[in-house]
């Protein structure tokens, strides 16, 4: 990877604000999470612009490529260049990925199939199968049987210690990778919950971790996109602090992924795998 123009941003901006409590007002310094447009470019063709916290962008780009099915494995990404443009009225970044020709040809074909659609990208599609929402059913690797009874409680207890940016801003999501005991091995924060997960998946891909031998713990709600991304890369369980959506539950059950939500040290709700 090459990194151009500037060092990686901190993820936080300090701003002067007026803070009011009751009848009193004062000038203070507030910390807010950075949000940049990040362009993802595959083999010279711009594919998407995502709004992200501008940290860990190499991991984010790889995780996005894998979890969205653009590439099948990390080795399909041959080169990554991250360009940070922090000066000017609109700071932004561009990530250039060079992928194998087979993956690029499939991406171009997918883009042609989507060309001409308007609106949300879902309207007008004839069947849910064409949405590519439900990945292949996950094999039973035995991980869930090895999961410690207090693993979810441990992850819930440990997550705040890995949320340094959230402690300062109150406005970021976290995605953590946990082992069978619930110990947190990796954790990433981002302004977008799906971005945080992509950063985590990218790191697991780049380090060649066994994604069938752990689970994801998220500080957010469980949306369909988080479940779909996790199932696509073979993660057997997703745990979230907040509520799931009905589509997230349906996708999890069809994929054979265990989804647990409302996770706290005291308990959780298990939405099952079947």
From Swiss-Prot:
The active site is at 120 (cysteine persulfide intermediate). Transmembrane segments: none annotated. The keyword Cytoplasm applies. One of its GO terms (cellular component) is cytoplasm. Keywords: Cytoplasm, Molybdenum cofactor biosynthesis. GO terms for biological process: Mo-molybdopterin cofactor biosynthetic process. InterPro entries: Cytidine_deaminase-like, FdhD. One of its GO terms (molecular function) is sulfur carrier activity. The keyword rRNA-binding does not apply. It holds the Pfam family FdhD-NarQ. It is found in: Cytoplasm. Gene3D superfamilies: 3.10.20.10, Cytidine Deaminase, domain 2. Its main location: cytoplasm. HAMAP family: FdhD (MF_00187). Belongs to the FdhD family. Required for formate dehydrogenase (FDH) activity. Acts as a sulfur carrier protein that transfers sulfur from IscS to the molybdenum cofactor prior to its insertion into FDH. This is Sulfur carrier protein FdhD. It comes from Burkholderia mallei (strain ATCC 23344).
């Amino acid at each position: 990877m090459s990194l151009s123009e500037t060092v990686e941003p901190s993820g936080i901006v300090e701003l002067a604000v007026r803070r009011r409590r009751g009848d009193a007002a004062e000038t203070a310094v507030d910390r807010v999470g950075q949000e940049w447009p990040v362009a993802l470019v595959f083999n010279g063709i711009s594919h998407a612009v995502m709004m992200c916290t501008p940290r860990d962008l190499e991991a984010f780009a790889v995780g996005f490529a894998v979890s969205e099915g653009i590439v099948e494995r990390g080795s399909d990404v041959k080169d990554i260049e991250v360009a940070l443009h922090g000066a000017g009225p609109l700071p932004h970044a561009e990530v250039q990925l060079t992928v194998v020709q087979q993956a690029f040809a499939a991406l171009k074909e997918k883009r042609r199939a989507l060309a001409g659609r308007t609106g949300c990208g879902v309207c007008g599609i004839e069947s849910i199968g064409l949405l590519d929402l439900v990945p292949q059913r996950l094999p039973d690797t035995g991980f869930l049987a090895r999961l410690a009874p207090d693993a979810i409680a441990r992850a819930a207890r440990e997550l705040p210690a890995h949320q340094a940016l959230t402690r300062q801003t109150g406005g970021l999501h976290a995605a953590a990778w946990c082992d069978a005991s619930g110990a947190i091995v990796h954790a990433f924060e981002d302004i977008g919950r799906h971005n945080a997960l992509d950063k985590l998946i990218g790191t697991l891909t780049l380090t060649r971790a066994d994604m069938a031998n752990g689970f994801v713990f998220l500080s957010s709600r469980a949306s369909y996109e988080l479940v779909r991304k996790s199932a696509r890369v073979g993660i057997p369980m997703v745990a979230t602090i907040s509520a799931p959506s009905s589509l997230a539950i349906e996708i999890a059950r069809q994929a054979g992924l265990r989804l647990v939500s409302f996770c706290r040290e005291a308990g959780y709700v298990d939405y099952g795998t079947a």
